[in-house]
């Protein structure tokens, strides 16, 4: 995977796009899956908890696998996720099969999540471009697009298998491209194939000196995984971000229905507006998120908190929707910024394990967010429960000043590459 290779440069974005395709189809097809299994809401809700039960241990283990085998694992795991969706359709006619299939999907999803985030963070560090933010934007965009496509396909065919088979074709194809583009690339910046080393010898002397200086810095700090506690703190702050983001994404349509008597079609505007705003914010804000991470976290936290308060007290549907959009604008940039910032000082040989640590802790917030909101909604109503979401982003704001004290992240600077020379693997995707 080299910077001169189009598939190599595109690999992180293709990986996240495939991940988004799967989860867009998943969200749109949950009613069909429930009907196919022949279970009620309560039993189906319990079965869905197995997504997290499968994901968490897989997330913990995958980082070490990526560090040992290389970045091609990301494409392999994405392919496995696409296949897992089809297997779920085949085995979910009974409750036991449904639970086993969902557990397998959760494990494949959690493993893929860590692998593609490691791929994006590695590409970002090597190129100096906002790859993490833009990869997450690709995820948001493809979730929205694939959910609409899957909904249309499900309405036309009524077939759960047709929807997941179509998703598998796309996801497996993207996974294959990602695996091929990264087949000779490890997480270590200095692990260049012989051919790339020869090409690197043709680089200008100043560029080679820059690479040598970077290799020396990595060698000094590459003996062990630094600051495991610091990574867990970053993950904890990420859990607050995920809890807030998922609460809005899950409950925004319910808010418009319960508080403002919106029709189903109008209520569906809320999650669609949230996803669209999130994708645009990540795409447009990538450079600022990369260069000014702490300022980004503070600004995004303030916007998200203001959005939560506005949503909680909005007297009209229009203002409530404005609050949801503001919250999307704020929450969308929080976790990508945290992940990029937290992984920046990590030695290349440990980036997979560091990604596992941050992502696994943050995922706990993703799992807890809807339940936390549900308890608040039961106590005080859906609209006022958004004050509790604003409290989460307010707590995140209070935690931001701690982050710079956890370590000294390396500055990200774009690396120049001659257009007529094939760069070394140290110049990345």
PLM regions: where:
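Intracellular juxtamembrane helix-capping segments at the cytosolic ends
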Residues: 111-125, 333-346
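Interfacial helix-cap and linker-helix signal at transmembrane-aqueous boundaries
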Residues: 33-34, 65-66, 152-157, 256-257, ...
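Helix-breaking motifs and short loop linkers at transmembrane-helix boundaries and internal kinks
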Residues: 38, 70, 91-96, 261, ...
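Short amphipathic helix-loop junctions that connect adjacent transmembrane helices
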Residues: 28-42, 250-266
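Helix-to-loop junctions at the C-terminal end of transmembrane segments
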Residues: 57-71, 154, 281-293, 377-378
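C-terminal transmembrane helical hairpin of 12-TM major facilitator-type secondary transporters
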Residues: 295-338
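Helix-loop-helix hairpin linking two adjacent transmembrane segments in secondary transporters
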Residues: 135-186
């Amino acid at each position: 995977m080299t910077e001169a290779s189009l598939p190599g440069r595109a690999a992180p974005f293709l990986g996240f796009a495939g991940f988004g395709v799967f989860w867009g189809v998943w969200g749109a097809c949950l009613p069909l899956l429930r009907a196919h299994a022949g279970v009620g809401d309560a039993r189906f809700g319990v079965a869905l908890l197995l997504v997290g039960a499968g994901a968490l241990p897989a997330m913990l283990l995958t980082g070490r696998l990526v560090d040992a085998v290389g970045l091609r694992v990301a494409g392999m795991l994405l392919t496995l996720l696409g296949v897992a969706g089809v297997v779920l359709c085949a085995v979910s006619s009974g409750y036991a099969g449904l639970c086993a299939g969902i557990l397998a999907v959760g494990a494949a999803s959690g493993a893929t999540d860590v692998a593609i985030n490691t791929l994006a963070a590695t590409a970002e560090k090597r190129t100096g471009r906002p790859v993490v933010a833009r990869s997450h934007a690709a995820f948001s965009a493809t979730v929205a697009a694939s959910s609409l496509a899957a909904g249309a396909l499900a309405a036309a065919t009524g077939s759960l298998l047709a929807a997941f088979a179509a998703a598998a074709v796309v996801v497996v194809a993207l996974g294959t491209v990602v695996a091929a583009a990264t087949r000779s690339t490890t997480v270590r910046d200095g692990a260049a194939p012989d051919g790339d080393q020869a090409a690197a010898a043709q680089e200008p002397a100043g560029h080679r000196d820059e690479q040598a200086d970077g290799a020396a810095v990595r060698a000094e700090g590459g003996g062990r995984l630094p600051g495991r506690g610091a990574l867990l703190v970053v993950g904890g702050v990420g859990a607050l971000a995920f809890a807030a983001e998922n609460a809005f994404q899950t409950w925004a349509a319910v808010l418009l229905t319960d508080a403002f008597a919106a029709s189903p079609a109008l209520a569906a505007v809320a999650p669609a507006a949230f996803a669209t705003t999130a994708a645009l914010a990540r795409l447009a804000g990538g450079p600022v998120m990369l260069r000014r991470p702490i300022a980004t976290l503070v600004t995004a936290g303030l916007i998200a908190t203001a959005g939560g308060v506005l949503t909680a007290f909005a007297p009209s549907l229009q203002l409530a929707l404005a609050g949801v959009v503001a919250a999307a604008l704020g929450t969308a940039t929080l976790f990508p910024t945290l992940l990029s910032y937290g992984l920046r000082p990590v030695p290349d040989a440990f980036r997979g394990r560091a990604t596992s640590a941050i992502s696994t802790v943050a995922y706990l917030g993703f799992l807890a967010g809807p339940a936390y909101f549900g308890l608040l909604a039961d106590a005080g109503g859906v609209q006022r429960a958004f004050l509790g979401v604003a409290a989460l982003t307010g707590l995140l704001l209070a935690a931001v000043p701690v982050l710079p004290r956890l370590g000294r992240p390396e500055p990200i600077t774009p690396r120049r590459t001659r257009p007529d020379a094939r760069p070394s693997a140290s110049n990345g995707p």
